[in-house]
Each structure stands twice: as C-alpha cells, then as structure tokens.
Amino acid sequence: MIMDYEAILNDIKPTSDEKRHIDDVSSDIMNFLQNACNSRGIDAKVTLVGSVAKNTALKGKSDIDIFIAFPLETKKEYLKEKGLELAHLCCREFDVDAEHHFASHPYVTTHIEGCEVDIVPCYAIKNGSELKSAVDRTILHTRYVKQNLTESQEDEVLLLKRFMAMTGTYGSEFKVGGFAGYLCELLIIYYGNFEET
C-alpha cells in the first residue's frame, strides 16, 4: 500500500492563515516582553522556542513557548521573581489569566488570541556545560534544530509526529511517556526522512 503523504500533510500541516496568526501573536508577545525588560532595566533576552520556532508544529497544536533568558550570573531568586513579574505584566497587557506551573522553576501558562502560551524564565547558556536548570537547554535544542533541519524535513517531522500520535507514542508528558517533539526532530535530522526513521 502506498501512502499519500501529501494528503496527510494537508490534514496535519498548519494553514498559512494559522501560521500567520501564530507568528503575529508570538511577535506581539515577544515585543511586549522585550520592551518590558528594557524599560525596567531587566537584563534578559526574550526568545521563541519549541515547535513554533522550528516550524514543526502540527495543525491546531501550535503552542507558543517564549523563554526569557537571563545572564548566567543572575541569582535564581531574581530570575524567578522577574520572570513571573514579566509574565504577569504580559497577562495584564493582553487581559488574560495566568496559570502557574513549576518545572525547574515557576513559569506561567496563559491563552492569548486562541493560542496557548508558556512564558518561561531560564538562563542564557552557550553550551550544555553551563546548564543550571533543565529548561535552559531548550534554547540550545531550538538553535540546533533550526541549523540542521532542512525545510523539506519539516514536513517529515510532521509525518513522524502524526504517526507517533496515531500509535499512542507521541508526547513526553507523564501520562503518555512517549517521544518528545525534539526527539522526532533529531530522528529526522539523523535518518533524513519519515520512511527511513
């Protein structure tokens, strides 16, 4: 049986309108947060990470992950305090509620213009040896994938994610215990395409 990958991609690839909306919302949030950092004298850089940044998000699953990267010498308490302060400022600006979560340190999840948004403080590391918390590596992961995944391979990642979702093996959450999106991207970078993976 021959698979019609184009038909599958039409079902799982975000439309140009969806991509444009996600890009616009992401830009608005990032600009607000970076301006808030600058106007308050907070030394931090706002960065888009995750599948939206890597162009590997499935249709309807375009969660926006925005990291606020603080210098390595920043004290952890300051990072937590200012990270949450900036996230709450953003929620007030967009008139939305903030949900608190905890990974290596607190972060905020909210919904802005129909998009789920995570605002996460982290440390700006240049390599894995500087890792201070688990979330710090996310920026490095995003950078690696963007540098190594070709445009045509982005579709291959979508096919792999969909296949894994259909078999119940996609999702790194505890209840699923499956493959993370980052692992799907690494597999496509290594093997080249969905069929070889």
Report each predicted region and the residues it spans.
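Generic non-transmembrane alpha-helical segments
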Residues: D28-G41, E85-F94, F163
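Short amphipathic alpha-helical segments, especially helix-boundary/capping motifs
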Residues: Y5-N10, S62-D65, D136-R137, L160-M164
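Catalytic cores of NTP-dependent nucleotidyl/adenyl transfer enzymes across multiple folds
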Residues: A103-T197
